[in-house]
């Protein structure tokens, strides 16, 4: 559970879902635990439920809110690959959340259009992605750990790697790890381990710098100072653009086509070696961040008008 890495960035919550994460549990088990925990604190409440993104928690809390007759406010609404199996279960989570939500905050024009095609046109707002605000604020504050700053010297050139997607597990991970090993012969690699992928160190070469998950500030520091990124993450596709770093996306689809359209990203599945030079070219098509700016202020302004 990576939530601890974010806890120092936000105020202590009034309610917290307790003991819902367990390694190896099924999606159904997690969903049930979330609903039961939400019942303990929020049943019969009239809170507006704000959910972000497409995680199992976001969808399940949307379902809870619907059953409890609470309004659902969805931030990062309208992202689509149009393939329910990729990513799994995130694509289904966001589709179902959209059809439950009362208010939709979309990051891009593409996401607004995705909702329109599904017949969702009321209370849809194009605001950008809050990740832009988070990135800029954290980088400007410069509150990074001594440990991560010592890991990366001023003239250090490295590639940053993260992998965790459910659809890449088993055979595909091994293929990607073999490619990463090949890349490591000529490039320093910092590989951030993920709790859901415990076997990575069995397959990776000793010369690869394997580190445990870092807090969000340090993660952005590693992104900002990297030479390029190799990942199957969704959020990293946005953070790469904010940092003006290129990213090889180890997937066959993306719900963030703006990263590719702007020249910062490329879908490569497991074919890292053949596409490695993409990270080092300078053909950025559009230097304007497609994910917006001052997003949080826009959202707050709309919420104040909607619920005054």
Task: Cite the ranges covered by each PLM segment.
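A nucleotide-sugar donor-handling region in carbohydrate enzymes
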Residues: 1-3, 97-171
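Conserved nucleotide-sugar phosphate-binding/catalytic loop shared by glycosyltransferases and other
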Residues: 1-33, 37
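Donor-nucleotide binding loops and adjacent catalytic segments primarily
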Residues: 6, 143-225
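Short acidic-hydrophobic, aromatic-tinged amphipathic segments that line or gate anion-handling sites
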Residues: 15-18, 106, 125-127, 210-213, ...
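Short N-terminal targeting/anchoring amphipathic segment
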Residues: 40-56
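A donor-sugar binding/catalytic signature common to diverse glycosyltransferases
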Residues: 51-52, 59, 63, 74-77, ...
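A short, histidine- and acid-enriched strand-loop-helix "catalytic/donor-clamping" loop
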Residues: 74-88
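Leloir-type glycosyltransferase catalytic cores
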Residues: 110, 266-308
């Amino acid at each position: 559970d990576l939530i601890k890495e974010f806890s120092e960035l936000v105020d202590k919550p009034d309610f917290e879902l307790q003991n819902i994460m367990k390694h190896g549990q099924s999606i159904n088990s997690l969903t049930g635990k979330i609903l039961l925990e939400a019942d303990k604190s929020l049943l019969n409440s009239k809170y507006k439920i704000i959910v972000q993104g497409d995680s199992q928690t976001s969808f399940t809390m949307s379902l809870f809110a619907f059953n409890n007759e609470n309004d659902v406010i969805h931030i990062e609404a309208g992202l689509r690959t149009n393939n329910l199996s990729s990513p799994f279960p995130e694509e289904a989570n966001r589709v179902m959340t959209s059809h439950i939500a009362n208010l939709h905050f979309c990051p891009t024009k593409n996401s607004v259009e995705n909702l329109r095609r599904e017949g969702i046109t009321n209370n849809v707002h194009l605001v950008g992605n809050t990740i832009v605000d988070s990135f800029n604020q954290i980088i400007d504050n410069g509150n990074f750990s001594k440990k991560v700053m010592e890991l990366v010297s001023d003239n250090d050139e490295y590639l940053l790697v993260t992998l965790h997607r459910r659809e890449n597990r088993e055979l595909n991970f091994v293929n990607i790890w073999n490619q990463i090993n090949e890349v490591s012969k000529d490039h320093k690699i910092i590989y951030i381990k993920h709790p859901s992928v415990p076997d990575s160190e069995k397959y990776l070469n000793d010369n690869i710098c394997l580190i445990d998950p870092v807090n969000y500030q340090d993660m952005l520091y590693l992104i900002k100072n990297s030479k390029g990124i190799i990942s199957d993450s969704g959020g990293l596709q946005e953070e790469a653009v904010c940092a003006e770093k290129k990213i090889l996306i180890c997937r066959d689809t993306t719900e963030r086509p703006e990263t590719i359209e702007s020249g910062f990203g490329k879908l490569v599945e497991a074919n890292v070696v053949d596409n490695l030079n993409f990270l080092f070219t300078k053909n950025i098509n559009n230097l304007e961040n497609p994910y917006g700016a001052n997003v949080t202020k826009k959202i707050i302004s709309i919420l104040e008008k909607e619920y005054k």
